Regions:
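A detector for short metal-coordination/catalytic motifs
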Residues: 3-106
């Protein structure tokens, strides 16, 4: 049975210059974390660690929309699971471009 618990997410969004459908521009994320990633609430750093975007976190806190955020953040701050084949790892250049595209200071 396919439960669709994991989705393919582009690191550098499809509409951005230099984006590709290559596996090195992709991540496997749950639907919730995929939306958070696409909306720049979370980002991947060049050490392959998923992190919270402090600017977005502050916005949510200011608007009092931060309920559940501590639990959400508990899954962040660790290196993501990477494929055994390093040729399939996220490309550092895509990560840098994606963070610049989303205006995330790393």
């Amino acid at each position: 049975m396919q439960l669709r618990l994991v989705e393919a997410a582009h690191i550098l969004p499809v509409g951005a210059q230099y984006s590709t459908d290559d596996v090195r521009n992709g991540l496997a994320l749950s639907p919730t974390y995929h939306r958070a990633f696409d909306n720049a609430l979370i980002f991947l750093d060049e050490n392959f660690v998923m992190r919270i975007n402090p600017t977005k976190e502050l916005q949510l806190t200011t608007l009092r929309l931060d309920g559940g955020l501590p639990d959400f953040k508990s899954y962040l701050g660790k290196k993501i699971h990477l494929p055994p084949d390093k040729r399939q790892w996220p490309e550092s250049n895509m990560i840098r471009r994606a963070n610049a595209y989303r205006r995330i200071a790393t």
